[in-house]
């Protein structure tokens, strides 16, 4: 079956927003309008529109799926049909892993901002992740009908706080309760949507006279931004010629895809205004899979290879989310980068190095799931029947293996012991935790060897709370949770040279002999562990050098201070000796381990603790309480600013995670429940001596 929609008419987009910016309503409206036009396209007597509306009102469609497919022919029906795959992204900081994961498979994004709140803390996190994966974006300023709505303030904030170049391609007609529509700066016409039929109908009118000067000013700025796309447009613009609508759109498209500008639109999803024009902007300015660079990966021999977004290249795809569905079991959502795959085909999981049969393939539409036989380059779909796949795995053609860049997930910073309340819960808990860990790579489960307890680790207190809650709701497991524990690390501050480890054993028969001399020094933060082989003249035979490295790596798991993992160290193997008969891999593994332990003791070992970026939004009256409380928690206040719309103050601080337990309770009591906060992991920093001593002593008890 040939593909219905050519790949240049695909748009894989994410809609991301701060919690209250109205993302769900915006997404619902997109599904509503695309569903309506899709249905109208099929039924020519017009009746479909109405019943679809009733059903929509009755059910209030909300995406629960990770990816939904919609079709769009333009607000005025003037485009060939485009296929828009919408990937859902959560708005909460503890789940930035989800956002990161979806950014990896998007080609473009629509950032939704609240017209009053503007750019908020989480908007910054999402923006940084979009920068990391070079995702082109458009901005939609929602809730223009709210009291305090200010489109231009949000435009300034995108510049000041996010360092983005926001170029309005619309400006609002009115604001707050007088918000009526928008001025399309490309056409230089005002658009008014008809509220009677939920904004399906609209009309272009002349720009209201009181807005003419403002519209001209922003139109000129937009044209200038578009003209900078290439020499040809720039020459025409500088020569005083007028750019056509097509040229303006082309210029904006080129610069948006190059991540140089962010086109800005506005509306009120709730009042059915503006979302339709935003969908047109998705088609006009966001890239198709052909407009973004080809995906690169490595073959089995670690050579870099490319896969192009066409159906004739070998099949390659990335699994980006796992969901457990009550009807079909486990769903693996995947993005196809190249080639075609059919249900029933065998695919190769390049990370797990296993072949698996692809069972059914499903695609989610606005309000239904549809079973499909095949998916093509650029598609996003969900597979049933893959047992081995987890998030971040590459699925590919078994005869043309590629490993796409593995997703890098943050290390958890907090852990808790969890115990089932009854014997019956014991077995169910194991199954539940494994299922949850499969879905969420930033959540880890392990067993403490000393105590035998099950330890769960994640990105924050809220993250673990929600997972324990899901265990109860979805799997019926009651569990008690221990006190949260901080994931400390150890490292060294000094360089030490010529430290030796010698493992010699003579006890009748064949002995053991391994001898290694190392230099240990601090490595840059975030580097992890680096091993350099500087052996000259064969003083240690080649085949034993990996054993020394292995011995050191095993020792890194538990440092000399308090048994925490060791990070950011560089070890150079400089010298050693061997015995013709008694030397073996095990002896050199032991020698490496002994040398490292000894070197670490001498290199001024220190304890590191996770530092969190904390942002508190509080009414001004409680400012003193909040600051005092953060300082008492060894917090460093890094800045304060007014919250837009007279909503109090935003305090930014860096606070050790160890001091943040129970913070939500004490913040509630310090501010009568009127402040809110977010926190996310920033980096590891050296723990002050008095605190480190207490941690080390507690560990040795």
From Swiss-Prot:
CDD domains: EF-G (cd01886), EFG_III (cd16262), EFG_mtEFG1_IV (cd01434), EFG_mtEFG_C (cd03713), EFG_mtEFG_II (cd04088). It holds the Pfam family EFG_IV. GO terms for cellular component: cytoplasm. GTP binds at residues 17-24, 88-92, 142-145. The keyword Metal-binding does not apply. Residues 8-290 form the tr-type G domain. GO terms for molecular function: GTP binding; GTPase activity; guanosine tetraphosphate binding; translation elongation factor activity. Keywords: Cytoplasm, Elongation factor, GTP-binding, Nucleotide-binding, Protein biosynthesis. The keyword Amino-acid biosynthesis does not apply. InterPro entries: EFG_II, EFG_III, EFG_III/V, EFG_IV, EFG_V, EFG_V-like, EFTu-like_2, G_TR_CS. PROSITE patterns: G_TR_1 (PS00301), G_TR_2 (PS51722). SUPFAM superfamilies: EF-G C-terminal domain-like, P-loop containing nucleoside triphosphate hydrolases, Ribosomal protein S5 domain 2-like, Translation proteins. It is found in: Cytoplasm. Its main location: cytoplasm. GO terms for biological process: ribosome disassembly. Catalyzes the GTP-dependent ribosomal translocation step during translation elongation. During this step, the ribosome changes from the pre-translocational (PRE) to the post-translocational (POST) state as the newly formed A-site-bound peptidyl-tRNA and P-site-bound deacylated tRNA move to the P and E sites, respectively. Catalyzes the coordinated movement of the two tRNA molecules, the mRNA and conformational changes in the ribosome. NCBIfam families: EF-G, PRK12740.1-5, small_GTP. Belongs to the TRAFAC class translation factor GTPase superfamily. Classic translation factor GTPase family. EF-G/EF-2 subfamily. This is Elongation factor G 1.
